[in-house]
């Protein structure tokens, strides 16, 4: 199985041209993914002989290419995209050829599964985890969700109110202590207020007014959650100087075939597979 990528930045038109060019010598499935991490996850999981991964270099490109593919009647394409917060609004995209990840993005889908337990077994310290959970009164997973949600609420707020905040300035590494694995919410809110031209009380009011009481993980974002987890593993629940790239890699490995087959996205892709000219999975 090849993983197609161009050196220049892609556009929907370039992606479709790439698929057409490959179709001259390849009669299998062109599987659209958003980026490099998605490609790394799916490469060992789709068929090595009848499917090729197309890295679209971003969600806008993937959705734009999918719209063009449907207009042109190209029938050899399927794909997966991150729904982000769109699921809260009931928004879906091109269900005839695409399926969303189970949670807001692929990383979050992996974290919300039993792959998290495998990662904690590998990189966490059992005694420290037990002590942390005893003191907090919740599991590591529940604490991770509650902490990452607070970053996600601000992402949601920025999106719906068009605050255009640079979230590189709001990295969990700045606001979550590696020593205690606690969030300095006051500092986080103050920084968001500074970046959006608001006051901290205004931000708190907007969070209460506009952010829904959504189920677990629905207001979290994968990169934030991975960074929060990496901070905890460095001292409070482990003793590993582990990077977010390491966390993401181990989660991909730990997400077993059994976990994949239990996922909604897998069942949706299996359903789409019946319309494709070749097998997506081996």
Predicted features, each with a name:
Residues 1-282:
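Acidic, divalent-metal-binding catalytic cores of TOPRIM
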């Amino acid at each position: 199985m090849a993983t197609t990528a161009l050196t220049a930045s892609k556009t929907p038109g370039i992606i479709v041209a790439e698929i057409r060019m490959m179709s001259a010598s390849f009669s299998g499935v062109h599987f659209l993914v958003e980026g490099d991490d998605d490609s790394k996850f799916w490469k060992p999981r789709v068929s090595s002989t009848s499917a090729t991964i197309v890295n679209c270099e971003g969600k806008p490109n993937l959705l734009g290419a999918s719209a063009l593919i449907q207009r042109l009647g190209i029938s050899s394409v399927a794909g997966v995209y991150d729904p982000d917060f769109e699921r809260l609004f009931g928004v879906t995209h091109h269900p005839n050829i695409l399926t969303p990840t189970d949670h807001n993005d692929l990383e979050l889908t992996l974290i919300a599964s039993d792959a998290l337990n495998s990662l904690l077994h590998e990189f966490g310290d059992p005694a420290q985890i037990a002590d942390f959970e005893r003191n907090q009164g919740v599991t590591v997973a529940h604490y991770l969700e509650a902490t990452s949600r607070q970053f996600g609420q601000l992402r949601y707020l920025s999106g719906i109110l068009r605050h255009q905040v640079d979230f590189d300035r709001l990295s969990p590494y700045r606001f979550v202590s590696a020593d205690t694995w606690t969030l300095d919410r006051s500092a986080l809110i103050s920084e968001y207020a500074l970046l959006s031209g608001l006051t901290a009380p205004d931000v708190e009011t907007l969070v209460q007014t506009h952010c829904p009481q959504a189920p677990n993980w629905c207001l979290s974002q994968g990169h934030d959650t991975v960074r929060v987890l990496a901070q905890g593993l460095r001292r409070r629940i482990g003793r590993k100087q582990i990077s977010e790239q390491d966390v993401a890699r181990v989660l991909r490995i730990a997400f077993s075939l059994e976990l994949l087959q239990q996922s909604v996205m897998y069942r949706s892709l299996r359903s789409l597979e019946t319309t494709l000219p070749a097998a997506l999975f081996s």
